[in-house]
Amino acid sequence: MRQDHLITATQLSRDDIEAVLDRAREVADDPAAYADRHAGSVLALCFFEPSTRTRMSFDSAAKRLGMNTIGMGDVDSSSVSKGESLSDTVRVIEGYADALVLRHPSEGAATLAAERVSVPVVNAGDGAGQHPSQTLLDLHTIRENHGLDDLTVGIMGDLKYGRTVHSLAAALTEFDANQHFISPESLRLPRSVRFDLHETGAQVREHTDLEGVLGELDVLYVTRIQKERFPDENEYHRVAGEYQIDAETLEDAPDDLTVMHPLPRVDEIAPDVDETDHATYFEQAHNGIPVRMALLDILLENAEGDEGMEVDR
């Protein structure tokens, strides 16, 4: 029996995405119908990097499905600090849990984990690679505000190291969205991501400033500069704060522009934006609960041999 994992957004077809988002809408409309749906099951939260929203929302989502959760706690207090390999760690944890959520600083870590275990694995961020469950809640937020067809989306900030960007850009190609990428030259999309987007037929439009494209956008997706990914701290300080928006920036934006951010933010969105009708990032964060409930529900259904979203690894 084939187990399903969610490792990259590129694995998701439009039908896969809509299956999760439709289920998420059902969960949001009638959460009681999903309570105790997976009572007795256990979700392992394996976070080798700091996390607030992703970890807590998966924890909450699992418990709202009736699951128990287990976690590693501080990595320094685990056997990883003794030199245990990721492969050994996940193979041991597989015996304790029915599904595994993994965040790791190394790109490809979730792929390795999925190759080693037979329970569903969800990639909760692998270095500067991907973050597909974040993409699902991003798309849910966009759909609830605009729908997913005929979109023009601007993605601004750290496009080189921002894993949420890489996942979202890939998923938006399933909906033929017009995408504009706004960043300093040093933080433009990685060549491999640009190549993959071109392979889908997507138009990759790159800009170094927001002003020229703001009026065209339905969605502006802002990301922080990923300080922890920079090999040279001097380079980080050179570009930090270069791409910021405030309420004044948005005065000429379309009235229905949705401003999103995967959070945490530093200074790239000023607090005065919170008071505008454009701000959607807290709604976006809250959408992590129904979306991750839906995702876990479907993956566990697949693991049990029922019909659900097909996610090939």
From Swiss-Prot:
Gene Ontology annotations of biological process type: 'de novo' pyrimidine nucleobase biosynthetic process; 'de novo' UMP biosynthetic process; amino acid metabolic process
Keyword Transferase: yes
Associated pathway: Pyrimidine metabolism; UMP biosynthesis via de novo pathway; (S)-dihydroorotate from bicarbonate: step 2/3
EC class name: transferase
Molecular function GO terms recorded: amino acid binding; aspartate carbamoyltransferase activity
SUPFAM superfamilies with a match to the protein in the record: Aspartate/ornithine carbamoyltransferase
Keyword set, alphabetical order: Pyrimidine biosynthesis, Transferase
Binding site for carbamoyl phosphate: 53-54, 103, 131, 134, 263-264
Binding site for L-aspartate: 82, 163, 224
Catalysed reactions listed for this entry: carbamoyl phosphate + L-aspartate = N-carbamoyl-L-aspartate + phosphate + H(+)
Domain of life where this protein originates: Archaea
EC number(s) recorded for this UniProt protein: 2.1.3.2
InterPro entries, A to Z: Asp/Orn_carbamoyltranf_P-bd (IPR006132), Asp/Orn_carbamoylTrfase (IPR006130), Asp/Orn_carbamoylTrfase_sf (IPR036901), Asp_carbamoyltransf (IPR002082), Asp_carbamoyltransf_Asp/Orn-bd (IPR006131)
HAMAP family assigned to the protein according to its UniProt record, in alphabetical order: Asp_carb_tr
Subunit structure: Heterooligomer of catalytic and regulatory chains.
Family listed: Belongs to the aspartate/ornithine carbamoyltransferase superfamily. ATCase family.
Physiological role: Catalyzes the condensation of carbamoyl phosphate and aspartate to form carbamoyl aspartate and inorganic phosphate, the committed step in the de novo pyrimidine nucleotide biosynthesis pathway.
Protein name: Aspartate carbamoyltransferase catalytic subunit
Organism from which the protein derives: Halorubrum lacusprofundi (strain ATCC 49239 / DSM 5036 / JCM 8891 / ACAM 34)
